[in-house]
Amino acid sequence: MMRLPWFEHRAPGSVQEAARILAGEGADAMLIAGGTDLLPNMKRRQMAPKILVSLRNIAELKKNGSVLGAGTTLTEIVRKTELPLGLRQAAHQVATVHLRNMGTLGGILCLDSRCNY
């Protein structure tokens, strides 16, 4: 099994703090929420950020209601009965339960998959 390369982990508590970290660290830093795409790419050495800036502790990205923040997981989308049925069904079709529990809307929208073959 390939191991992750070394990286520093930062967990800001606000969008403003995350933005300050990104501005200060530049290209050495990347955002991470669920990590379902980023971490496998790091294991394959397709990406090698020196700093991962976690979005998990930023409450404003997980607001209640029909607003879907970048940190909303696919499982949360499936369970939001106020959302259109088609959107909930589409979220339910993505990957496995484990990946739906981890994968975030922001990560899916910013997905940077590459063919490894």
Range-by-range predicted roles:
Residues 1-117:
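C-terminal structural segment of proteins
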